[in-house]
Amino acid sequence: MQKLTLPAPAKLNLWLHIIGRRADGYHELETVFQFLDHGDELSFALRDDGVIRLHTEIEAVPHDSNLIVRAARMLQAQSGTTLGADIWLTKVLPMGGGIGGGSSDAATTLLALAHLWQLDWDEDRLAALGLSLGADVPVFVRGHAAFAQGVGEQLTPVDPIEPWYVVLVPQVSVSTVEIFSHPQLTRDSLPLKMRPVPEGNSRNDCQPVVEQNYPEVRNALNSLGKFTEARLTGTGSCVFGAFPSKAEADKVLALLSATQTGFVAKGSNVSMLHRKLQSLVKKSSA
């Protein structure tokens, strides 16, 4: 196979608790990740000259600093391959939105190039490499909804309900560093003792600080909160609410469209990236 096109799905933090701070400054978290059937798209074409080249209309991030390029070059170096790739990014997910855009792009890149370069790398090895790029990358590599601990890299598969979501996208980018360094951030939530993880935990410890500092996010939460429980994902800026049907979610988004930007997507416990990869494996073995 010389060319490959794959999705890079969004994720939600259904809830997020901060239970402590480590000596290295990183925070200890407990959260549940679930995927959305909505995301970026990446296409990969094989090169035999070892060059990694990203083609995108997004100019906010320098080419060599882009997580996609960093992921590709890291996999190239660690595997010892002499192959390269042209990569085309169709960007849909917002940057600074808390729905995993950059991390998801990096994970899709690792999985796609491992496939395209015919590397004998399993998920464990790719996830470990992904962690060096960002704490959220491993869950996208694994591709299953998960209860996450540590900085978000210790993953236990879970299967929460899969509703339809309205996701509002405030026109502001929230700085994760700013939120996690804020003096008013809650850092002492009690670790969960129950297993399996209860679904009733409906709190994001970052939300009060983000609401206080970003009025656009506060307005989005208030708007969506008139129809269902609205919550921040990650450190934002995106907020979400669950609905039992697409029709109901579409109706609410339409009612909010005069003042809010957003989208409707289905929650999924197996990412659309992994569903696509599984279908490719089935086709190749047929």
UniProtKB/Swiss-Prot annotation:
Q: What does this protein do?
A: Catalyzes the phosphorylation of the position 2 hydroxy group of 4-diphosphocytidyl-2C-methyl-D-erythritol.
Tell me which EC number(s) this protein carries.
2.7.1.148
Q: Which reaction does it catalyse?
A: 4-CDP-2-C-methyl-D-erythritol + ATP = 4-CDP-2-C-methyl-D-erythritol 2-phosphate + ADP + H(+)
Q: Which family does it belong to?
A: Belongs to the GHMP kinase family. IspE subfamily.
Q: Write out the residues that bind ATP.
A: P94, M95, G96, G97, G98, I99, G100, G101, G102, S103, S104
Provide the alphabetized UniProt keywords. ATP-binding, Isoprene biosynthesis, Kinase, Nucleotide-binding, Transferase
| Gene Ontology molecular function terms on file | 4-(cytidine 5'-diphospho)-2-C-methyl-D-erythritol kinase activity; ATP binding
Record's keyword annotation contains Kinase: yes
Show the HAMAP family listed in the entry: IspE
Gene Ontology terms describing biological process: isopentenyl diphosphate biosynthetic process, methylerythritol 4-phosphate pathway; terpenoid biosynthetic process
Q: What is this protein called?
A: 4-diphosphocytidyl-2-C-methyl-D-erythritol kinase
The top EC class is transferase
Recorded source organism is Pseudomonas putida (strain ATCC 47054 / DSM 6125 / CFBP 8728 / NCIMB 11950 / KT2440)
Give the superkingdom in one word.
Answer: Bacteria
